[in-house]
Amino acid sequence: WNACTKQSDCEEDECCLDNLFFKRPYCEKRYGAEQRCSAAAVYKEDKDLYYFTCPCVPMYECLGKGSLDENGNTVMKNPKCIMPTL
């Protein structure tokens, strides 16, 4: 893996990720079009790093069918990287 300190250290289909398990951030592949994804990607603008997981490739969003759990929280079912429609 390639160590990084900011997004521009990585390829376009990667993100600079600090997943808290490794001592240093590294370049990780972003989720591709129609791939299952995690909506847990958190971007910290001041550090120019993502935490937990990478987002989808540019122009795609991690979206799924929203449903409510027993506590009234919205949960995404089967999220995938899709291009949002206008």
Swiss-Prot record:
Entry-linked Gene3D superfamilies: Lipase, subunit A (2.10.80.10)
Protein name, per record: Toxin CSTX-20
GO cellular component: extracellular region
Compartments where found: Secreted
GO molecular function, one term: toxin activity
Annotated family: Belongs to the neurotoxin 20 family.
Record key words, sorted: Secreted, Toxin
Tissue: Expressed by the venom gland.
Segments traversing the membrane: none
